[in-house]
A protein has these predicted regions:
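Residue-level marker of positions within ordered structural domains that often coincide
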Residues: 45, 103, 161
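Conserved small/polar residues in nucleotide/adenosyl-binding loops
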Residues: 154-161
Length: 162
């Protein structure tokens, strides 16, 4: 787990020109705090303690403005920059080396059972205010433009921009 924390810190240092030091990221960056808390919540969920997992998730959302469901799968070196207003749903899968900016929703479109949230492949950038809804896939290294809306049954191929 600590290796992933180090990777996350390095990711923020590399992608945020305003980041001055690792201690600044650990203490002051809501995106880092939300990712750290998500990993704890997911551990509790995986060990059959869903109430504790949801408690951690909701407490973190209240503190950071970033709501990540404990069931969401988040890859390595994911950066959440200016994290206010981010929602990541239960069956969302986020790959490695993904950048997520403020106001992004990775959400469902209803009360369907099973896979109902997006899959974000490696290397994707999701711009500010983008809404990616339903069980769709955003392909490797794609860029979802700020304010874009991508809905169910759409497949944005690798290296495309919405």
């Amino acid at each position: 787990m600590f290796e992933r924390y180090k990777e996350d810190i390095q990711c923020f240092m590399e992608h945020d020109p305003a980041a001055r030091s690792p201690i600044e990221i650990v203490l002051l960056y809501p995106g880092f705090k939300a990712l750290r808390s998500h990993r704890k919540a997911q551990w509790f969920l995986n060990h059959k303690m869903p109430f504790i997992a949801r408690y951690i998730s909701q407490r973190t959302a209240h503190k950071t403005g970033i709501e990540i469901h404990p069931g969401a799968k988040i890859g390595r070196r994911v950066c959440i920059d200016h994290g206010n207003g981010i929602v990541i749903g239960e069956t969302t899968e986020v790959g490695d080396d993904v950048m997520i900016y403020q106001g992004v929703t990775l959400g469902g479109t209803g009360k369907d059972l099973g896979k109902r949230h997006p899959t974000i492949e490696n290397g994707v950038m999701i711009g500010s205010g983008a809404k990616v809804l339903g069980p769709i896939t955003i392909g490797r290294n794609a860029k979802v433009a700020a304010g874009a809306v991508a809905v169910s049954y759409t497949h944005l191929r690798a290296h495309e921009t919405s």
